[in-house]
Swiss-Prot record:
It is found in: Cytoplasm. This is 14.7 kDa heat shock protein. Its main location: cytoplasm. Residues 1-11 have a biased composition (Polar residues). Residues 22-131 form the sHSP domain. Keywords: Cytoplasm, Stress response. The gene is HSP14.7. It comes from Arabidopsis thaliana. CDD domains: ACD_sHsps-like (cd06464). GO terms for cellular component: cytoplasm.
Length: 131
C-alpha cells in the first residue's frame, strides 16, 4: 500500500504529527485509511459530527472531492469543524466514474471499483483542500 500526501505545511515546512485520541479505546488511530479489496479501493475518512445531509462530493476525471461541516453549537461556543479534501486515483487501474460515496455515523466511505483485468496497486494521493 502506498500513500502520498500533499499538504500546505506550516512555516517550518514540516507536517505536524496527528494527535492520538486518548478517548478512543480500540481500532485504528489514523484519521483516514486506504485499503484494497479484490474488486475495489476503499477509503475511510473520519469526519465526526458531520451529518450525511451536509456531505458534498463530486468526481472530476480521476479525482474524488468531498466536503462536510459539523454543525455549529453556539450554546457551547463551538463553531463546528470543517472537513474537505480530494483523493486522486490511477485512471488506468480504477473506474473513478463509478465511485460510490457514503457518510455513515461521521465516517466517510469512498469506494472506487477496479477496472477488470488491470493490475491495480494502491497508489492514491490525497490533498487537503482549504476553502
Amino acid at each position: 500500500m502506498s500513500r502520498n500526501m500533499e499538504v500546505n505545511a506550516g512555516s517550518s515546512g514540516e507536517i505536524p504529527s496527528p494527535i492520538r485520541n486518548r478517548f478512543q479505546k480500540s481500532g485504528s488511530q489514523a484519521v483516514y485509511e486506504v485499503t484494497e479489496t479484490k474488486k475495489s479501493c476503499v477509503t475511510r475518512v473520519d469526519m465526526p459530527g458531520c451529518p450525511e445531509s451536509d456531505l458534498t462530493y463530486w468526481v472530476d476525471a480521476n479525482n474524488v472531492h468531498f466536503f462536510a461541516d459539523e454543525p455549529a453549537m453556539p450554546e457551547y461556543e463551538n463553531a463546528g469543524r470543517k472537513y474537505g479534501g480530494s483523493m486522486i486515483f490511477n485512471p488506468e487501474a480504477y473506474d473513478v466514474k463509478k465511485t460510490k460515496v457514503k457518510l455513515i455515523n461521521g465516517v466517510l466511505w469512498i469506494t472506487v471499483p477496479k477496472i477488470p483485468g488491470k493490475n491495480a496497486s494502491i497508489n492514491v494521493k490525497e490533498r487537503i483542500l482549504h476553502y
